[in-house]
Amino acid sequence: MLSRGWHLVMQGARQLAGPLACWWLAGILLAVLAKVLGILVGGVVSLLGLLLLSAWLPAMVARSNHESWQAGQFLYRWVLLMFTAVWWLPLGWLGYLATLQASIQLPATVQNIIFNTRYDWLPVAGPFWLLGWLISWKWLPALQRQLTAPTSWRNYWRTGWRISWWTVFKKSRNVWLFLISWLVMAIIGGGIVWASGAVSQLVSQFVAVFMMTGLQLLAWLMFMGWWSRLWPETAIAGHSNWQTGLLTLTGLLVLGGYAGWWLGTPPTAPLAIIAHRGVNGRDGVQNTTAALKRTVKQVQPDMVEMDIQPTADRHWVVMHDPTLKALAGQPGPVHEYPVDKLSGLPLREHGQKGYLSTFKQYFAVAHKLQQPLLVEIKSVGTADQLMGIFADNYAQRLIQQKGAVHSLDYRVIERLHQRAAQLPVGFITPFYLTDFSNSVAGFYSLQALTATREQISAAHRQHRIVYFWTVDRPLAMQRLTAMGADGLITNRPGQLRRLQGQSKHYYFYQLINWLVSWL
């Protein structure tokens, strides 16, 4: 496997001396440009960068075939590639999905509709996409044939239909082996960067830039080697040694400059520690005043995030789940109970006991402890219709205590903002398609699993704060801090507090962020 991999890399290196050397350099420049635009600009500009990058591949094919310019063939190849890319979109596009997300910015109200109806369409769309993706493997050889010798859509469909799925999968094993080899080298490189952090941060920075540049170069050389197998004549030397050296040096400078820019420098702003549901590990029952008191005493978090939802008689109780079954062992939705049936209800979790509080009771304890709250208003029952009453009763006191409100339902924060414009409100979203510039949200609570550099940059360009939830593992805490998060919502605020200030491995975590961004 190693010998085949090395042979492929050497074949790719010969492309830098071949007739397509300038085209390969253009591809590297476009690939870097698209990523930089996605992070720095977004919107239409980064979408244009993606379109230019997508046009490069069919142009390369035409050049490799020595074809004269034919708009029809170019468009046919481009559409085939885009059609395939759509099925492979959820797999990340080697990091360019984040660029696409930064380019397509939907109004928050539209994203709100998509998310709030997810349980209606996702059970259908998810299996449908998975089935389509598995079937799409059958058409990969057909795509390759149409790129090298385009005929018609009919032949494309017929070729894919006739070939067996297992045959295609077996033929792709070399690709998997090369990917595994690249990943192993990335792991080894990451270990070296970690070790260099113990020497000094400057050494760690240099090693991280070197490793990231090398990994990018290796990926490109593997791609070039695969190209040489399809078009062997493109690896025949066509440039003098000094021209080859100049083109190679330019490519290395582009990749190295991008690596240095992407890795950046350690953030200087303090990270907000936000205790999720008011707990510190398993020190109490979530969303209870007993857990709140222990957490504040042990950790003194910057904010305590807690959940409220309306009752049948238009009061508010502190509860995360829509039903009482998990914590209280009682049937029925919370919003169907009157407040007097809920207040003081015994709750059990992790072998501990607590009592269900009204928001008024919980808020009073937080005020006594001088603890700012981040209140999540659950979108259940008539929550969005009660924002006027909520604002009248709690907005000014939340402002005075440096608190804030966020919700998964954009209608909630929009109506609350209309009644109390000075109260900080945030939009909770598990995925990012939002146009941050036209939103009442002053901050965003984003799902940590889908965190990207593009998300943070887009929000910061519009002077929005970014929190990530729910971040409980040390690796995730460190890498999201390195990525530039303004705060982390965690069930382990004590652990996060202990990790603060341990920045000697910043470049290791940024390298991890870059590797994760390929997914």
Predicted features by range, described:
Residues 1-271:
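Hydrophobic alpha-helical membrane segments
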Residues 204, 208-212, 223-519:
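Phosphate-group recognition and catalysis centered on beta-loop-alpha active-site segments
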